[in-house]
From Swiss-Prot:
Protein name: N-(5'-phosphoribosyl)anthranilate isomerase
Pathway terms, separated by semicolons: Amino-acid biosynthesis; L-tryptophan biosynthesis; L-tryptophan from chorismate: step 3/5
Tagged with keyword Aminoacyl-tRNA synthetase: no
Reaction catalyzed: N-(5-phospho-beta-D-ribosyl)anthranilate = 1-(2-carboxyphenylamino)-1-deoxy-D-ribulose 5-phosphate
Organism the protein comes from: Rhodopseudomonas palustris (strain BisB18)
EC number assigned by the record: 5.3.1.24
Entry GO MF terms: phosphoribosylanthranilate isomerase activity
Family listed: Belongs to the TrpF family.
GO biological process: L-tryptophan biosynthetic process
Entry keyword set: Amino-acid biosynthesis, Aromatic amino acid biosynthesis, Isomerase, Tryptophan biosynthesis
Amino acid sequence: MPLVVKICGLSTRATLDAALAAGADMVGFVVFPASPRHVDLALARQLGDATGDRAAKVALTVDADDALLESVIETLRPDILQLHGHESAARVAEIRRTFGLPVMKVLGVASAADLAPLPDYAAVADRILFDARAPKGASRPGGLGAVFDWQLLRDLDLALPFMVSGGLTADNVAEAVRITGAGGVDISSGVETAPGVKDPDLIRAFIRAARASQELMI
């Protein structure tokens, strides 16, 4: 299966166009005011319309209530909901049932103990995204440029697709894919020059490196 490449936290037309032109499979839009990558609903609509069907649109929310999710879905018309907060497995199932969209649940990882909830989430989500667990007291759950121990996912037996994120760059994405066997990679801060400021050249370089990483495994 081709490696799925997601560029997350896009907030300008120029960087969105760069990601799409470079062949991103998924583009992520963050609706979470505490994040430097936050886009309001008006901008989300513009970026979603510009994306069209060239890539899957992913709406990232954090512990959102139904009212916010409904607004995001109506405005952005996403293909996937990314739940990046402390949503329980029951809440994931409820969101999936209520809104009828595929759900990608993010699981923060710092040690093997963080994988304990995985079976419960795998039973209700459509895709799992493993990210570095944010340190205690952090103002946001991801996009911090931190790497987790990929060896924790080696030989992972998971019946549904999974992706990895957290501190990825063009220089280390091949190793991340090789060790974890992930079917997809997700990057945000690794293609930025400052928090929330995406760089088209870094986006292109990352996507090239991600594609090359799969060729090396064939």
